[in-house]
UniProtKB/Swiss-Prot annotation:
GO terms for biological process: translation. Coiled coil: none annotated. PANTHER family: 50S RIBOSOMAL PROTEIN L9. Binds to the 23S rRNA. The keyword Transmembrane helix does not apply. This is Large ribosomal subunit protein bL9. It comes from Ehrlichia ruminantium (strain Gardel). GO terms for molecular function: rRNA binding; structural constituent of ribosome. Residues 162-176 have a biased composition (Basic and acidic residues). GO terms for cellular component: ribonucleoprotein complex; ribosome. Keywords: Ribonucleoprotein, Ribosomal protein, RNA-binding, rRNA-binding. Belongs to the bacterial ribosomal protein bL9 family.
Amino acid sequence: MLSVILKESVRNLGKAGVVTKVKPGYARYLLAQKKAVRATKENLKILEEQHISIQQENLEKLEAAKALQVSLKDEFLIIIRQAADDGKLFGSVTPKCISKLLSDKGYNIHYHNIFFHSVIKYIGEYVVNLELHHDLVVPMMLYVVKNDLGAMQAQKLHLDKQKKEEKAKDEVSATEKDEELMLSSVTNDNDGDGAKEIVVEGTEESQ
């Protein structure tokens, strides 16, 4: 195990500035990606001196991740794989496969930053998670199909889903707007009502 200082937040390891131990292979990845430096006495001293600048750099990376999130908003992935009649793949879909698909679309996301909840071994629909930043994980739909026809069907299915979701959002927005107008109307009516004076007549005493 090697000790490294995180220069930015990393899932399952910690936030920027934390000293942690990792396996040599993972340490090489972190060092190559400039996500960490070796935990030497000199680097620990530099860390203390540059703590504020490291935090600022981390915030800038978070803003860049948010911008990437916007670009990924309408994206989805389709991958063609050979499978048996029961839909079981001859192999599996790995984070490296997802990273390659994203790279083909122009997005540079390392496979270490891609994860899903279970191994993908069957044809079907899945949600893969893209860790754009320690504090920002973006879900993306993945369709695993057997052939080009399946890819066309998956594309149509996804676009239909998007249209339904957009329509549902528009309906919710319209309903909320109507409710706001009704509330505003009721409030204005109440404000227009003047206070009414109630006069109670006294009873004359018998002479």
